[in-house]
């Protein structure tokens, strides 16, 4: 199936001369009171930054987690207010989803510099891209997706990420779950596989000569 022309505006990786050996860890669907602190602990242990694509409704519930991740050197990005499929939304609703999430983030942590947007489910449309540009946000997709949300096993998550690791790779992981899976979001062990895999992925990337950064 041919990729729509407008999708060329959504980067799936990031490379530049100065960041030729960088890999970017990103986390969607948080903040979550069980998972996000554990993810932050692993990142702190290995002294690497990441970018967290936060859902605005969760940010309002757990502003302290946004303040913590910013204080620890991570970036917060926009993952909309309620995580809808934006392809089913009219342009006004798309704008509202992005604007309300942005306001929730900066209200939780005025120091947060929100520079990126990731569409829920990775579903991009021309309306979404236009709204992203008007909001001053760079659209970001991914190049490495181990589908950790499906709990495929720690080895699968690690192997998929390492197989896709190359200069500029953007890795998609999760520190929560969408609001329509709210019952799972209350499970303390929701992202245990992601957590264990992350503790293996980071040193493995370093051993391959990659530097891990948050999105530029």
From Swiss-Prot:
* SUPFAM superfamilies according to UniProt: Glycoside hydrolase/deacetylase (SSF88713)
Instruction: Spell out the catalytic residues.
Output: 28 (proton acceptor), 174 (proton donor)
Q: Where is the NodB homology domain?
A: 21-213
The answer, when asked if Cytoplasm is one of the entry's keywords, is yes
Q: Which residues bind a divalent metal cation?
A: 79, 83
Q: What is its EC number?
A: 3.5.1.-
Q: Which GO terms describe its molecular function?
A: hydrolase activity, acting on carbon-nitrogen (but not peptide) bonds; metal ion binding
Chief location category: cytoplasm
GO BP, sorted A to Z: carbohydrate metabolic process
Places the protein is found: Cytoplasm
Q: What keywords are assigned to this protein?
A: Cytoplasm, Hydrolase, Metal-binding, Nodulation, Plasmid
GO cellular component, as recorded: cytoplasm; membrane
Q: Where is this site: Raises pKa of active site His?
A: 148
Q: What does this protein do?
A: Is involved in generating a small heat-stable compound (Nod), an acylated oligomer of N-acetylglucosamine, that stimulates mitosis in various plant protoplasts.
The family annotation for this protein states: Belongs to the polysaccharide deacetylase family.
What is the designated name of this protein? Chitooligosaccharide deacetylase
Q: What is the lineage of its organism?
A: Bacteria, Pseudomonadati, Pseudomonadota, Alphaproteobacteria, Hyphomicrobiales
Question: Gene symbol?
Answer: nodB
């Amino acid at each position: 199936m041919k990729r729509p022309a407008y999708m060329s505006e959504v980067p799936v990786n990031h490379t530049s001369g100065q960041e030729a050996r960088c890999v970017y860890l990103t986390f969607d669907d948080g903040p979550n009171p069980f998972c996000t602190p554990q993810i932050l602990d692993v990142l702190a242990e290995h002294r690497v930054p990441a970018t967290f694509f936060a859902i605005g409704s969760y940010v309002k519930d757990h502003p302290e987690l946004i303040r913590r991740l910013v204080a620890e050197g991570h970036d917060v990005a926009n993952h909309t207010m309620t995580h809808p499929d934006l392809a089913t939304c009219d342009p006004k609703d798309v704008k509202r989803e992005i604007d309300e999430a942005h306001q929730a983030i900066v209200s939780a942590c005025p120091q947060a510099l929100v520079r990126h947007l990731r569409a829920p489910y990775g579903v991009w449309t021309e309306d979404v891209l236009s709204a992203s540009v008007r909001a001053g946000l760079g659209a970001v997709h991914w190049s490495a997706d181990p589908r950790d949300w499906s709990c495929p096993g720690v080895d699968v998550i690690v192997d998929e990420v390492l197989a896709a690791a190359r200069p500029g790779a953007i890795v998609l992981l999760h520190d929560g779950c969408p609001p329509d899976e709210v019952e799972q979001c209350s499970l303390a062990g929701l992202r245990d596989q992601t957590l264990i895999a992350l503790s293996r992925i980071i040193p493995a990337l370093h051993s391959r000569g990659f530097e891990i950064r948050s999105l530029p």
